[in-house]
């Protein structure tokens, strides 16, 4: 079930719990990929009882991230969470895609079985998908019968079995494959995202 609620606004940072600013955890705006540091921070916030990861001004690169219960994400103005364009930064696992359960690449943002998950702010989640789309359309020129899954691409956001999800204010763009893949989620609140 998807609910579009015009009364949903971008939550205030203070509503999302203790703030963890990524630059305090060895994640930098320097073009390098910081997947391991991002995931360690997600796990740290989870183990501390929850809170909000804050992405400040700048562009920060990562591969697949796996969010956990109580961990939210806030992307500030002029801040970008940028996905790696290298498919090896998205591990293969059992997932739902194209109407079936199979082994396929993870998304940039992954959440499974979370109750109360917020992605918000006035910043950007950018899938960095140009390289993947060029490869997909090139494949289609020499094999018009290829399927969407034949070209190895990551989704941007994948949520499975989540409830009470808020996505507000963000600019979500340039996915390598599907942008928002919501599987068996309920009570999803979106606003200006």
List the predicted regions and their residue ranges:
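Conserved small/polar residues in nucleotide/adenosyl-binding loops
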Residues: 1-6, 189-193
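N-terminal extracellular ligand-recognition/capping segment immediately after the signal peptide
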Residues: 25-27, 35, 50-96, 102-105, ...
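Acidic/polar low-complexity surface segments
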Residues: 83-103, 126-153, 191
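Right-handed parallel beta-helix/beta-solenoid
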Residues: 4-37
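Surface-exposed loop/turn segments connecting beta-strands in extracellular beta-rich domains
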Residues: 62-63, 78, 127-128, 174-176, ...
């Amino acid at each position: 079930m998807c609910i579009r609620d015009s009364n949903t606004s971008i939550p205030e940072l203070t509503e999302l719990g203790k703030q963890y600013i990524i630059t305090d955890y060895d994640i930098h705006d320097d073009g390098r990929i910081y997947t391991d540091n991002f995931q360690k921070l997600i796990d740290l916030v989870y183990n501390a009882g929850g809170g909000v990861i804050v992405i400040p001004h700048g562009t920060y690169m990562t591969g697949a991230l796996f969010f956990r219960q109580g961990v939210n994400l806030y992307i500030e103005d002029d801040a970008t969470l940028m996905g790696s364009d290298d498919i090896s930064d998205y591990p293969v696992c059992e997932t739902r895609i194209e109407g079936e359960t199979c082994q396929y690449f993870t998304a940039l943002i992954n959440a499974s079985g979370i109750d109360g998950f917020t992605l918000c702010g006035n910043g950007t989640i950018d899938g960095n998908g140009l390289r993947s789309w060029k490869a997909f359309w090139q494949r289609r020129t020499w094999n018009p019968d290829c399927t969407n899954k034949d070209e190895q691409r990551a989704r941007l956001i994948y949520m499975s079995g989540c409830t009470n999800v808020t996505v507000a204010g963000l600019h979500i763009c340039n996915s390598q494959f599907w942008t928002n893949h919501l599987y068996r989620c309920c009570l999803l609140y979106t606003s200006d995202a």
